[in-house]
Amino acid sequence: MVSRVIYRPFEKDDFSALASILKDTWHTYVPNQEYNALEAACDLVHSLEISSFSQVVLVDDVPCGIVLARAEGDRLPHAKECHAAMDAFLERMHKLEPKATDEYLSFLEAEQRVNSRLLEQSGLARASQITLLAVSGTARGLGIGSVLLDAATSYVASRGAEGLYLYTDTDCSWKFYERRGLKRAAMYRANREERHVLPREMYLYGMDLSA
């Protein structure tokens, strides 16, 4: 049976399904599934906060993937609303699992520190950013990730971007980006002390859009 596939901008009703994709992909370390769901929701709302472009794929009316991006100089229309939502999620997380929440906040702080270093090393500080790309495990292998990435690339190019970048790491499918023409522009290897909060290696991938 042929599935019905639709691409369109993010809508609020997509949030729960997309957060569930993030949970199943990256937020599985705590036995408390309610906490894991909140942590994934926190990640999604943060990505929405720093983005100005969205594209969601629906397969048979079910959200199965999302790409978010920000072109250099874009306004961030949802920043205030998303920041408040993130604070609310963090409060609920802390009530459920205070230790896990503290570890999550330590991860965010360390991740931001490393990402800033990667961006400085890459020379792409004025490029546009792909802030999130996630596809449900049930929809992988169908070319959906490539379509979503192309949509974000086309958007930032239409805004005059001469380059784009994204962050990824050894917990993600970084080889996908190499197959799509992005090149590794910077790398960071976590030291022994950092490995309890950070992935083994973290990368910045970039693409030249000036041609």
Segments (PLM) and residue ranges:
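A short beta-loop-alpha structural element at the N-terminal edge
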Residues: 4-20, 71-72
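Helix-loop element at the rim of GNAT/NAT acetyltransferase active sites that forms part
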Residues: 20-36, 73-76
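Active-site rim helix/loop that mediates acceptor-substrate recognition in acyltransferases
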Residues: 33-59, 64, 68, 89-92, ...
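Conserved acyl-donor/pantetheine-binding loop and adjacent beta-alpha core of acyl/acetyltransferases
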Residues: 73-128, 192-197
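Conserved GNAT acetyl-CoA-binding A-motif
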Residues: 127-128, 156-169
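Conserved acetyl-CoA-binding loop-helix of GNAT-fold acetyltransferases
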Residues: 135, 141-154, 179
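Conserved active-site alpha-helix within GNAT-family acetyltransferase domains
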Residues: 146, 170-187
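Conserved catalytic-core motifs of GNAT/GCN5-like acyltransferases
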Residues: 165, 183-201
